[in-house]
Amino acid sequence: MATIATGLNIATQRVFVTSENRPVCLAGPVHLNNSWNLGSRTTNRMMKLQPIKAAPEGGISDVVEKSIKEAQETCAGDPVSGECVAAWDEVEELSAAASHARDKKKADGSDPLEEYCKDNPETNECRTYDN
Amino acid sequence: MAVSTIYSTQALNSTHFLTSSSSSKQVFLYRRQPQTNRRFNTLITCAQETIVIGLAADSGCGKSTFMRRLTSVFGGAAKPPKGGNPDSNTLISDTTTVICLDDYHSLDRYGRKEQKVTALDPRANDFDLMYEQVKALKNGIAVEKPIYNHVTGLLDPPELIQPPKILVIEGLHPMFDERVRDLLDFSIYLDISNEVKFAWKIQRDMAERGHSLESIKASIEARKPDFDAFIDPQKQYADAVIEVLPTTLIPDDNEGKVLRVRLIMKEGVKYFSPVYLFDEGSTISWIPCGRKLTCSYPGIKFNYEPDSYFDHEVSVLEMDGQFDRLDELIYVESHLSNLSTKFYGEVTQQMLKHADFPGSNNGTGLFQTIVGLKIRDLYEQLIANKATARAEAKA
């Protein structure tokens, strides 16, 4: 898996084609930048910088699938170990995120204009007239 | 001389203040009288009060049905912050801000893997920062809150949160840290039984490629020790607990479609009067199905009784089964008291308004709506009480 240097900011919103030949939109731009303005924080926190994995092909569904396989492999030996529990916790978190992404796509109706107009109702493109 | 005051909702949320006091804002108005050219200074103090509500739940942070019902009762739809991080977990409406406590993870996903801990473990959460920021918001001070990105598993740049009228902190640990617990004006624990949790996660996850019954079960079982150690004990501190259990109306039911929901309400909580059915403090068992309420199998059954919960006196209101027709809910509502409704039928109206929400035909929707009304009532009582206290202090 390719890694990207810390601090490099990539925001991407692309359409991926999954193995079922369905276009899958990411829930939103994926911000990979993990640096922020430390001066604005109210407390000092030691942040260990580490490489960031690139946005995977296929969106979050593939990430869920990978994490399930990884959890099953990690837990094959010792199902009550810390590694095993943390692995399944990741599955749970990613499954919830995937569920939210599905709900959001369903609610938005996959219409980019509606999504844009929700955030920018005052623009010319989004004006509607009752008469 | 009467002076009219015009200010927008945004002004009420402003953090700008003219005095050192952080709990009040002062607006200077100038009025020119037509007869004379003298100007009068009128001083009006607008008090910005924030109440803090804690909601403990296993998952579904920030986007849950409960949050949407709650913010609907308070007025306005809650939405992610405009122009902000699209992966933000925060929801904001005119009166309410919902903060996801996952944003106070001290370890991101990769840190947790390295440390071999789950997100439920207190070692993966920064309770010092959580306490400082919730306290600041309660005192009317804006904060730069971190954002935990559930998609990438990393901590994103922070977002600015303005103090709202009602602040809801939702997540795994709203009542875990004693300092945070003491900041809460009201707290709720969603207690989902293992059977219902399993059924709901099947419904959620079987649509996802890679998941199976085995993986869902393994995921729940792996998290259970940490859940029992760090999450479940919080329910002893909750002012209200919503217990979701399988129905007892269908023998040996294992589908999880029909639910029995119990609303456990603590007695003696300030500004909170428990809801009751028929007579306060009595013991009621009621099957409302008949001419006024249409029911199909397995029907509906209500229970109401005083009880003890973790050595605390409580009132328990229970609904088993589901409604066939939501408009007939008014009949049930008319037999409940202390609902804190502003008009007859407000509960039914709220339920009909969100008939498409999950759980609208069972006790989860009904009790979530009722809790929303109680929180609104608590907010109004608290504001009125503080206004009275300030008036007395001036005298």
UniProtKB/Swiss-Prot annotation, chain A:
Family stated for the protein in its record: Belongs to the CP12 family.
Expression by tissue: Mostly expressed in cotyledons, leaves and flower stalks, and, to a lower extent, in flowers and stems. Barely detectable in roots and siliques.
Disulfide bond entries: C75-C84, C117-C126
Annotated consequence of substituting C126S: Normal under reducing conditions, but can form dimers under oxidizing conditions. Impaired interaction with GAPDH and loss of formation of a ternary complex with PRK
Membrane-traversing stretches: none
Species annotation: Arabidopsis thaliana
Gene name as annotated: CP12-2
UniProt-recorded name of the protein: Calvin cycle protein CP12-2, chloroplastic
Transit peptide start-stop: 1-53
Post-translational modification: Contains two disulfide bonds; only the oxidized protein, with two disulfide bonds, is active in complex formation. The C-terminal disulfide is involved in the interaction with GAPDH and the N-terminal disulfide mediates the binding of PRK with this binary complex.
Pfam family name, one: CP12
Curated annotation (Swiss-Prot), chain B:
CDD domains: PRK (cd02026)
Disulfides per UniProt: C61-C100
Source organism superkingdom: Eukaryota
E.C. no: 2.7.1.19
GO cellular component, one term: supramolecular complex
Compartments it resides in: Plastid, Chloroplast
InterPro entries linked to this entry: P-loop_NTPase, PRK, PRK/URK
Pathway connected to this protein: Carbohydrate biosynthesis; Calvin cycle
Transit peptide residue numbers: 1-46
An annotated GO BP: reductive pentose-phosphate cycle
Reaction equation(s) it catalyzes: D-ribulose 5-phosphate + ATP = D-ribulose 1,5-bisphosphate + ADP + H(+)
Keywords: ATP-binding, Calvin cycle, Chloroplast, Disulfide bond, Kinase, Nucleotide-binding, Photosynthesis, Plastid, Transferase, Transit peptide
GO molecular function terms attached to this record: ATP binding; disordered domain specific binding; phosphoribulokinase activity; protein homodimerization activity
Modes of activity regulation: Light regulated via thioredoxin by reversible oxidation/reduction of sulfhydryl/disulfide groups.
Class of this enzyme: transferase
Family: Belongs to the phosphoribulokinase family.
Name of the protein this chain belongs to: Phosphoribulokinase, chloroplastic
Organism: Arabidopsis thaliana (Mouse-ear cress)
